């Protein structure tokens, strides 16, 4: 009888321990707020900015998971575009995407010019092949427009001049989460005194004095994933006019 009583006491004690551990461990699982977790996830790449010499990426390794084959050093993809609506039914979008293969230490991509229409009309898109050597963009396709040719050859990615060393100082953002994807978003009001905003205004024709919004979007695991992606947008849009810069830097398997 005493033996059974001791067993009962042990079981009761075990239940109490499990309950306390579960309740106490809840905060550990939750940890930082989702806003802080999103910023920390972005900081893994934004801390690398500014990447003045893109060839430095050949010697940097990103987050690796089971999608990488053995021996694959991976590939960095950097992207920047500037979109602006010129009419109520048109949106012009120009930018560049560059893939830097760490296995071959080569960088290839393209500059794109797109025009979107709201009405029943297909969008126009033209890609111009480029490569990078000695941190210089080399245009591979023939371009007759001298202004476009100059824009391509002198193009700089946002990540080459952006600086987010003070990212932790951004607080009280508007957070939204889609658990089905999952995806995470946070938005911050920026100041026109922000150096990143000043840089963009000096490089692009932004016809508004409105201070922009910084929008950070993550698809996939906050801890990191080669399947998901992170996108940063600085949105100057006002009323019915869309004006924004989109940037991302991702690390994925080079061998598929």
UniProtKB/Swiss-Prot annotation:
Compartments in which it is found: Cell membrane
Q: Looking at the Swiss-Prot or TrEMBL record, what is one Pfam family this protein matches?
A: DUF576
Q: What is its main location?
A: membrane
Keywords (alphabetical) are: Cell membrane, Lipoprotein, Membrane, Palmitate, Signal
Put simply, this protein is called Uncharacterized lipoprotein SAR0442
Q: Its family?
A: Belongs to the staphylococcal tandem lipoprotein family.
Q: What is the lineage of its organism?
A: Bacteria, Bacillati, Bacillota, Bacilli, Bacillales
TM region positions: none
Q: At which residues is a lipid of type S-diacylglycerol cysteine covalently attached? A: 23
Keyword Repeat among record annotations:
no
Its membrane topology: Lipid-anchor
* Lipidated sites in chain (N-palmitoyl cysteine): 23
